[in-house]
């Protein structure tokens, strides 16, 4: 049976409208009105955009969404490049508050935080870092969710071989291979980190 319309209104909870996948010139790559029409034709009543970012990037995204503010909910992203600065926590807290005031509905933390981001000593930046408590507490105070992408499929953390169930994916995308545990945290470590984070901030 061909189903042309969903039985219920659809909320697309994970979409990308901006530079993360489309590059800095994303605003020239699609027409927002046409995009909304296609979403509505598919039964989508609203969508959560993970490319809200903050500051001027957020302003740029909101301009791209003008006229369709009720259709899109933006989640902000945070910048960890100044992680080692003494005022990093205070500045990031202000970014969260400002982005929320400008309309962001949540925070998105990407897997690069613990897989690629490093402090000045070369150690992975962890989501259960006590310094991050202020971010989670601020989000709770503002009544916005924190969406975390922690790790990837467990097979990405084991060596690529004929016994690896994701061998074909790893062959096509070798950058998804996190099996070097001298370079990356193990899958088990990442899961423990996630449990610690949720336990501390239910």
Task: Indicate residue ranges for each PLM-predicted region.
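An N-terminally biased module of ancient metal coordination in phosphate/nucleic-acid-related enzymes
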Residues: 1-67, 90
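A short helix-to-beta-strand connector/capping loop
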Residues: 6-7, 70-71, 202
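Single, functionally critical "micro-switch" positions that shape active/binding sites
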Residues: 11-13, 148, 202
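A conditional alpha-helix N-cap/helix-loop micro-motif detector
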Residues: 25-29, 54, 85-89, 125-129, ...
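Short Gly/charged-rich anion-binding patches and loops
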Residues: 34, 94, 134, 192-193
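Generic structural signal for hydrophobic
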Residues: 38-39, 99, 139, 197
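Active-site gating/metal-coordination segments in enzymes
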Residues: 58-182
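Conserved N-terminal glycine/acidic-rich loop preference
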Residues: 173, 181-201
């Amino acid at each position: 049976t061909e189903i042309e319309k969903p039985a219920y209104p659809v909320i697309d909870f994970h979409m990308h409208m901006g530079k993360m996948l489309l590059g800095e010139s994303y605003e020239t790559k699609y027409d927002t009105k046409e995009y909304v029409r296609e979403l509505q034709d598919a039964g989508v009543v609203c969508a959560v955009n993970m490319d809200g970012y903050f500051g001027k990037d957020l302003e740029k995204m909101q301009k791209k969404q003008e006229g369709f503010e009720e259709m899109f909910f933006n989640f902000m992203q945070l910048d960890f490049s100044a992680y080692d600065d003494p005022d990093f926590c205070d500045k990031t807290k202000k970014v969260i508050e400002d982005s929320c005031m400008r309309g962001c509905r949540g925070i998105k933390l990407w897997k690069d935080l613990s897989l690629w981001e490093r402090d000045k000593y070369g150690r992975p930046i962890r989501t259960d870092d006590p310094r991050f408590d202020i971010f989670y507490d601020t989000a709770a105070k503002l009544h916005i969710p924190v969406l975390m992408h922690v790790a990837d499929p467990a097979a990405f953390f084991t060596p690529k071989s004929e016994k690896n169930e994701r061998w074909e994916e790893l062959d096509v995308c070798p950058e998804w291979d996190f099996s070097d545990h001298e370079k990356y945290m193990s899958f088990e470590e990442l899961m423990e980190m996630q449990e610690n984070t949720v336990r501390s901030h239910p």
